[in-house]
């Protein structure tokens, strides 16, 4: 994979680097390389690649303290799928809109009156957001559901839908995936600073503070980092920023015993969740953190593939 990334970086023209790009470009390859380096615990490369993007004049964090129309830049990033920090997005149009990212979390298209969510945010996630952290307002809202009980639940509205597609087709829950954003690069570099041979918690704190200042009303959000709290701060900030963008499983898996004292994942029952599955617990070393290889691949003629442990 590293050789493929190197070839991509050499072949993809930097001329097409810029926010909101819909075609593969050099910056996207660098963003992927930074993520891969972090996963491989290559802290130096993770820092170098993320720094290249952070210091580029092509991107900047979408701030809640700047507005476009009636929305702040960060909220606009999600309602219109456009913003200065998007390194690469999967482009959708009213005529070709792909899947519905928001359907499992909202189910509003059912009757366009009430919400019928399959999943609701965990209460511990909602509790992570401080009062001036406007990611809370951009990601979550309380709304009445259309289920028989008619209860008001906290819902994920991050993928409520692209404003253009909603206005053209009255079709909700269609949002453009944004696999690479500048915000992730700050999180990558902050973690790498903490995990390198000689940790630099001051630089890590500077990166997290920079990110948080763009998300907090009036630019507050300063955070301190040290040898005792860095893991908790990194883990929590990745949840606050990247919630439901596909990073969590990989994060818990790669952190192992560093995170939550090796306790892995525990689901806590809450009022709007079903009893089944609400008591799920998986320690960091549980085999189910690695998915099974499809049976047909293991049993194919001539296959030398061995099934993952536990399956």
Question: What is the predicted function of each stretch?
Answer:
Residues 2-103, 128-311:
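Acidic/polar-rich alpha-helix caps and helix-coil junctions
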Residues 99-113:
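Acidic-aromatic pocket-rim loops
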Residues 109-125:
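Short, cationic low-complexity segments
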């Amino acid at each position: 994979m590293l050789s493929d990334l190197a070839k991509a970086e050499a072949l993809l023209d930097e001329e097409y680097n810029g926010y909101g790009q819909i075609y593969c470009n050099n910056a996207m390859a660098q963003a992927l390389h930074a993520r891969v380096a972090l996963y491989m615990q290559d802290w130096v490369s993770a820092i170098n690649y993320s720094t290249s993007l952070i210091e580029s004049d092509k991107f900047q964090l979408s701030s809640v303290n700047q507005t476009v129309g009636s929305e702040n830049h960060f909220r606009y990033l999600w309602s219109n799928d456009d913003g200065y920090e998007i390194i690469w997005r999967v482009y959708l149009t009213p005529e070709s809109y792909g899947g519905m990212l928001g359907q499992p979390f909202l189910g509003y298209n059912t009757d366009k009156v009430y919400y019928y969510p399959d999943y609701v945010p965990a209460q511990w996630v909602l509790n992570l957001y401080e009062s001036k952290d406007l990611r809370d307002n951009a990601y979550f809202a309380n709304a009445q559901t259309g289920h028989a009980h008619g209860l008001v639940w906290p819902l994920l509205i991050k993928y409520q839908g692209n404003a253009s597609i909603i206005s053209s087709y009255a079709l909700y829950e269609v949002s453009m995936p944004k696999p690479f954003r500048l915000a992730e690069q700050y999180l990558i570099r902050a973690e790498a600073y903490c995990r390198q041979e000689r940790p630099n918690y001051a630089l890590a704190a500077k990166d997290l503070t920079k990110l948080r200042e763009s998300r907090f009303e009036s630019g507050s959000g300063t955070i301190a980092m040290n040898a005792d709290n860095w893991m908790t701060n990194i883990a929590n900030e990745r949840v606050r920023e990247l919630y439901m963008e596909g990073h969590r499983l990989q994060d818990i898996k790669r952190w192992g015993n560093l995170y939550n004292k090796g306790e892995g994942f525990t689901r806590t029952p809450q009022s709007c969740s079903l009893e089944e599955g609400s008591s799920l617990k998986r320690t960091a070393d549980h085999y189910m953190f690695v998915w099974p290889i499809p049976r047909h691949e293991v049993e194919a003629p001539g296959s030398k593939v061995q099934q993952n442990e536990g399956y």
